[in-house]
Amino acid sequence: MKKQILGVLLGLSVVLSGCSSQSTESMLQEVKKDTKEIKSGKVTMSLSLSDEKEGSKGNTGYEMSGDEKFDPLELKMNGKFSGLGKDLEVEDYIKDGVYYTKNGVGSKAVWFKKKGPTDNKHALSFKSGSLNMNDDILNLLDKKDNWDVTKDGDKVTFKLKKTDELKNKVKEIHNKELKKELKFSEFDYNIEYVFNKKTNDIEKLYFDLSIKTEGTTSKATNKGSLEEINKEVNIELPEESKKARELLA
């Protein structure tokens, strides 16, 4: 009788283990599918460039946030550009294939415009600028061993591991996107997907990438997040944008 009970318990543990594994795999596939189908969201994007030789004087970059709609690309972003020890407030739009930017505030504000990207790619676009929505990164969701999993109630966070194999893969993907063959003295990343298992929906995407190329003293850190996924986004241009000057470059 004791052996029979032990046999039943062993069988149950195998079944439960299989269910747990299948549950993780099915969630990863849902994350992959949902991410490919994202149409809009609330975006944050930032870039920080620093140089060891220049110290804080050489720090440049931007911090922007706003709404983005994919295919065709439309966005509204507010934030600041930093450089030479100064911050410049900016407001950027892409609407109907035209890129608009407002530099400065109040009476000193100046509007510029130029033809927008024809390939739906832009530095401030989460879809084209993030690691999360890259097809090669999404393919890594096919293997659950690639991911660390943490659970908080109904929310499950999948974070790409940092094994040598995966780090080399991310380097390869990054170079492929840049169409360059760079070698790095520093390379670190975080790539996360937050999934709500109750609603069966993706809730948040996050990434950061910090790199230093061999033979240089400069370091670049890029970060981004996408939340309020598939929110309704209606981009309206301010009246003053009608007076925007044409950008030559």
Where are these regions (language model features)?
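C-terminal motif of bacterial Sec signal peptides marking the signal peptidase cleavage site
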Residues: 15-18
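Positively charged n-region of N-terminal signal peptides that target proteins for export
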Residues: 1-8
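Nucleotide-cofactor and metal-assisted catalytic machinery
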Residues: 11
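Subset-of-secretome marker
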Residues: 20-249
